[in-house]
Amino acid sequence: MQSNKAQSNQASANKQSAKVRLDKFLCDALGATRKEATKIIKSGDVTVNDEVVKSGAIKVTETCVVEWQGREIQKQGPRYIMLYKPDGFVCSHEDGFNHTAFVLLDEVKMEDLHFAGRLDVDTTGLVLITDDGQWSHRITSPKHKCAKTYRVWLADAIGDDYAEKLAQGIELRNEKEATLPASMEIVDASNNELLLTITEGKYHQVKRMFAALGNKVDQLHRERIGNIVLDDALEPGEYRYLTQEEVDSVWS
């Protein structure tokens, strides 16, 4: 009987040796027809391990880096995306009045993607996008109490009692129960700037919480969801794929 280590090594070797034609790989990864995949390859825009390939018969493995027009093509499987949402974009596939944040993505099979938690049209910052329903449910389901941290700029001065009241829960208009305890950290009192962490996602919740305290949110920016922090390297409108560590953090 093989040891667990030997079995693991064998599985790894099998994974590396499993080969598939490049045109088949592109069909699966891009949702393209065989004819479309062949055209893409012959264009000269496809590289395998940094070498231009013009034959769909070339075999690739899971360890190969396949790029099309300079962007790595993700292997088959769920996609996990971090987007820096700018002001003026809505988190939906269609909207009759505003741009949808999906126009910022250069992805195939866009219809399979959805937002793991939304932001208001005028709120900026971290948005997570995926085609993995179980993963996004872990973030959005109220029972999991996934923490979200926002940077908030208020119209008026930060009240001395805000932190205590937010920790106790705020009674919101048209809500039967008070909000769950939230934590607040003052960043710059002279600029009415603070960080707020909540563990639920009611409609316009942050804005309504401060309205209930007699203040108004001038600007709102989401910085963190769970242990996933908005990448400082991203500019508004840019995105990247999550690392495996970031993906796995949602389950911890």
What are these regions (language model features)?
Residues 2-252:
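Basic, flexible Lys/Arg- and Gly-enriched helix-loop patches that mediate nucleic-acid binding at interfaces
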